[in-house]
């Protein structure tokens, strides 16, 4: 399918979109079709009944994904220490630890709204999964993987405790769009590719706030995107999940726009020490009192814990209420 696309925000050079083979298709059958119809009805109900000025994501399995006990909080609740226990939150949650979550944590009907796509741009072909409304989305969430990852990681329904399945459902059921792309690197080329990808979908959903979630080394792209003036104007929030700090953010367009920032970090992260990320979080508040920043420390959690344990709905609804 060929389409010349307007790119009013960024010179992304997008010229076309083509569809690839969709991974992990759900089983067919009458029951699956009926469940899908109910899913579509639920999406339309949310889309047409929720007032835009009060838009927030409707619940999805909140009782399973809400944070466990809060051990400590300060900064008016913007800094929290969450009780994380490996035996409970991995072994007690997964059917096969770290490989397959128990079935009650997921709903694979959302796969009916999932496509494996690519766009051709001046930055190259960008492969990505898109879940939900590719036009007129109410909200867009983009997940950028870390070192060694790929676009498949962000749509795997069963790893990381089913948390990727939850964000897919939260977007799809609320008239939103979820994107999980491939990209070449964590430097300038990768940033150009993600800018082109987001420009493509932003042109089709001009009212949608765009949330960028960056896992581990993917944070390098979060910080690069924050430095882009035109891009920063569309960012609804940045999520740093087991990632690192960048002092240049304090002088970025996104910072001056007071774009909400969420940090999720394990206290036993051996890749990026939690103390340095906490210090950066506090530096934001010191430079700009009242800045919309949150930090969730998962006590005893490790490098990958925030991807498993971050409460997507709680975080994104907070950002929706605080975005510029």
Where are these regions (language model features)?
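N-terminal signal peptide c-region/cleavage motif recognized by signal peptidases
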Residues: 49-51
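N-terminal cap/lid segment of alpha/beta-hydrolase-fold proteins
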Residues: 81-134
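Short, surface-exposed "cap/lid" segments of acyl-processing enzymes
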Residues: 122-166, 170
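Alpha/beta-hydrolase active-site loop
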Residues: 184-205
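Primarily recognizes the serine-hydrolase "nucleophile elbow" in alpha/beta-hydrolase
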Residues: 209-257
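Short beta-strand/loop motif that positions the catalytic acidic residue
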Residues: 262-265, 269
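Short alpha-helix in the alpha/beta-hydrolase fold that links the catalytic acid
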Residues: 273-283
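C-terminal catalytic histidine-bearing segment of alpha/beta-hydrolase fold enzymes
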Residues: 290-324
């Amino acid at each position: 399918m060929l389409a010349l696309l307007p790119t009013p925000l960024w010179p992304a050079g997008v010229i076309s979109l083509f569809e690839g083979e969709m991974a992990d298709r759900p089983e067919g059958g009458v029951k699956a079709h009926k469940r899908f119809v109910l899913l579509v009805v639920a999406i339309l109900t949310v889309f047409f009944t929720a007032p835009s000025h009060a838009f927030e994501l409707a619940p999805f399995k909140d009782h399973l994904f809400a944070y466990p006990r809060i051990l400590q909080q300060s900064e008016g609740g913007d800094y929290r220490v969450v009780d994380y226990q490996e035996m409970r939150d991995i072994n007690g949650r997964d059917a096969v630890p770290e490989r397959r979550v128990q079935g009650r944590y997921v709903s694979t009907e959302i796969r009916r709204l999932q496509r494996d796509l690519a766009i051709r741009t001046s930055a190259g072909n960008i492969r990505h999964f898109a879940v939900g409304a590719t036009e007129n989305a109410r909200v867009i969430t983009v997940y950028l993987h870390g070192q060694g990852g790929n676009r498949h990681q962000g749509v795997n329904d069963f790893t990381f405790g089913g948390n990727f399945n939850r964000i897919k459902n939260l977007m799809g059921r609320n008239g939103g769009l979820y994107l999980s792309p491939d990209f070449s690197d964590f430097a300038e080329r990768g940033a150009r590719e993600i800018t082109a990808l987001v420009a493509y979908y932003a042109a089709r959903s001009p009212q949608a706030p765009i949330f960028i979630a960056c896992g581990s080394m993917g944070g390098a792209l979060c910080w690069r995107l924050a430095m882009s003036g035109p891009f920063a104007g569309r960012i609804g929030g940045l999520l740093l999940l087991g990632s690192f700090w960048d002092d240049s953010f304090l002088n970025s367009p996104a910072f001056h726009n007071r774009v909400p920032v969420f940090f999720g970090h394990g206290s036993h992260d051996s890749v990026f020490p939690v103390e340095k990320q906490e210090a950066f979080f506090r530096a934001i508040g010191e430079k700009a009192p009242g800045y919309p920043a949150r930090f969730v420390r998962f006590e005893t959690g490790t490098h990958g814990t925030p991807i498993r344990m971050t409460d997507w709905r709680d975080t994104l609804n907070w950002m929706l209420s605080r975005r510029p």
